[in-house]
Amino acid sequence: MSFRSHMPVLFRHCDPAGIIFYPRYFEMLNDVVESFFAEVANYPFSEIHPENGVPTADLQAQFQAPSWHGEMLEIIFSLSRLGGSSATTRFVVSCQGKPRMTAQSVLVHVGSNRKSTPWPSHVRFALESLLEES
């Protein structure tokens, strides 16, 4: 299964040529992760961050084509691996079925000591729903 989100390419996302300035993609991906944690895992970042966190430990991206101001992007979020305190993510960004960007990251659940700590059971259950079938 996957978590799908739609995001418009806004003026603030673009460089003077009218295409997404690539670091903005990473903000969009984080927005999708944050939405998933709030809407599906019932673990909103506003409640996580006073004591815990879900930092990105690794991030890789591949860009297939530019995205333009005014377009609507679909972002598909899934997991290729779920560990005790980490998750390996996969993102596919497209516009009208045409690939624009793919990315993989590793998210780590950390405690107040900023060391990895196991996912809470209800969060792990929600994350399991994102695991890709092998």
For each of these PLM feature ranges, what is it?
Residues 20-21, 62, 74, 92, ...:
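Conserved beta-strand segments that form the floor/walls of ligand-binding pockets within enzyme
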Residues 3, 68-69, 80-134:
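HotDog/MaoC-like acyl-thioester-processing domains
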Residues 36-81, 87, 101-102, 108:
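Hydrophobic beta-strand-centered segment that forms part of the acyl-chain substrate-binding groove
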Residues 1-56, 111-134:
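Hot-dog-fold acyl-thioester-processing enzymes
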